[in-house]
Amino acid sequence: MTKQEKAINLSESAQVDQQSVQPFPRSRKVYVEGSRPDIRVPMREISLDDTPTDFGGETNAPVLVYDTSGPYTDPNVIIDVRKGLADVRSAWIDARGDTERLDGLSSDFGQQRLNDAELAKLRFAHVRNPRRAKAGANVSQMHYARRGIITAEMEYVAIRENMKLQEARAAGLLKEQHAGHSFGANIPKEITPEFVRQEIARGRAIIPANINHPEVEPMIIGRNFLVKINGNIGNSALGSSIEEEVAKLTWGIRWGSDTVMDLSTGKHIHETREWIIRNSPVPIGTVPIYQALEKVNGVAEDLIWELFRDTLIEQAEQGVDYFTIHAGVLLRYVPLTAKRVTGIVSRGGSIMAKWCLAHHKENFLYTHFDEICEIMKAYDVSFSLGDGLRPGSIADANDAAQFGELETLGELTKIAWKHDVQCMIEGPGHVPMQLIKENMDKQLECCDEAPFYTLGPLTTDIAPGYDHITSGIGAAMIGWFGCAMLCYVTPKEHLGLPNKDDVKTGIITYKIAAHAADLAKGHPGAQIRDNALSKARFEFRWEDQFNLGLDPDTARAFHDETLPKESAKVAHFCSMCGPKFCSMKITQEVREYAAKIEAVDVTVEEGMREQAERFRQEGSQLYHKV
């Protein structure tokens, strides 16, 4: 530890990022209660102004939106990152009666860190003793689902996915929604707890929720549900602190990150992860091989199964919800990458490839896969089977190495399912648009509809600094085709470690991609927010336009650059067209004119009817005697 690190006592000094705890404008946190009082599902309610009288003068119902920000945006909750978030799930876990509290950490490395006095000032101060399944028990959501049990977590996500859809319909918020094309997905008109159970039992969806992460607000990942996004955080050997990483977490979930992966490779990985998990209302994923490599000083050849196993237990006892495991990088696939333009670009993939070549043995993650499953089901950690041979350039897309590994991931998925362990599959990468659907179709075929989770894909390689856009295009497409979760890409991709601004930009970009995919799939209720914003735009309700958007701050700032006065917030134009050329203002004038013409036409028509009736009453004679 440096002198500066020794001087910092995080258990005394750590503070929440103040930007992350500000409520959104005109929004309030609401909770929808389930069948028991401790099932309280958070949503964000956006209140709207009334329609102006010259547009018909009506009341606009508030709009509910999916909320990943946890208690951070609830003004009634006091946030103290030194203590962590409130417990959401322990009562549910206790009621199932299949877990036990350990006397302490059981991993060797975890005990070593706990006993290191020098780390006391960096350590999260309120560490609980971990839980583990009782001997012979399986505590995975898939295991419960296959036994016909609807857990509290399943009910929770059903409420969360529905977003009070019936009430929205009754309020007239869904008068219009285009039919979608779901490419064979089975999206119901309403998400029920029983449907959630069926999808998890089938392996088509997962609820990543480690029994040691009771703070998590359950969410679901699957092709028949809302498309989710993941945001990556984590330190490197070159920088960032624990406090900065917690700030990135809270900032990311504010803008809509459904899960967060901690990809730390620098100092104090164990301590950083503890702070992140204790303060996270969303599932946390990791790549355990990164930390295992740090334990052998970065020498891949020195990795051994026993050390990796201890790392899995260490992280499972902290509460990691899903592990990226690169078990599909087999020895026979490595030579297939030799002629690639960019070779092996996955960090985990390159580590395992190097180990395989150095020992000329099969990947130990593959040979010990059943043992990994035993660990996963003891804590309900989900697999995210890593695509270690994903293409790192569009030139390498859909090659033999990539698809060979995908076939192996399908084989491993079926092994995980035999253990009732939840599983999703990671995907590319860099893929031109015309090859994206082939990726999705092959994944569905090889992995039997297990959820797909892709990094983009990036559709072109020519735009360093703008890869959030090159990948957002591919993300929207593959989300439409059936991908369940999209891993965000920031503007710093390939260039450097992202900061807070980069995190926000990446998340907003991917929220757009995910929502566009939901619309295209025809997810029930997906168009509610679009309809509300379009109506506000036509009625020149500027504040409602800002507040209904994914990023109210930026929308308001852009508007105010040229029209900063409050009077401009009720003006019937913006600076793009000005008062005389606003298409929506002109359209309204045309409507008013048409209404007047229609009124004249009605008067004329009534007069003609009266004359016709008089003609008939007078005998229908063309001429009358004078």
Curated annotation (Swiss-Prot):
[4Fe-4S] cluster binds at C574, C577, C582. Pathway: Cofactor biosynthesis; thiamine diphosphate biosynthesis. Zn(2+) binds at H430, H494. Its cofactor is [4Fe-4S] cluster. It catalyses: 5-amino-1-(5-phospho-beta-D-ribosyl)imidazole + S-adenosyl-L-methionine = 4-amino-2-methyl-5-(phosphooxymethyl)pyrimidine + CO + 5'-deoxyadenosine + formate + L-methionine + 3 H(+). Coiled coil: none annotated. Keywords: 4Fe-4S, Iron, Iron-sulfur, Lyase, Metal-binding, S-adenosyl-L-methionine, Thiamine biosynthesis, Zinc. GO terms for biological process: thiamine biosynthetic process; thiamine diphosphate biosynthetic process. Its EC number is 4.1.99.17. Residues 1-22 are annotated as: Disordered. Substrate binds at N232, M261, Y290, H326, S346, R347, G348, D387, G388, L389, R390, E426, Y453. It is an enzyme of class 4 (lyase). GO terms for cellular component: cytosol. It comes from the Bacteria. Residues 10-22 have a biased composition (Polar residues). Catalyzes the synthesis of the hydroxymethylpyrimidine phosphate (HMP-P) moiety of thiamine from aminoimidazole ribotide (AIR) in a radical S-adenosyl-L-methionine (SAM)-dependent reaction. This is Phosphomethylpyrimidine synthase. It comes from Pseudomonas putida (strain GB-1).
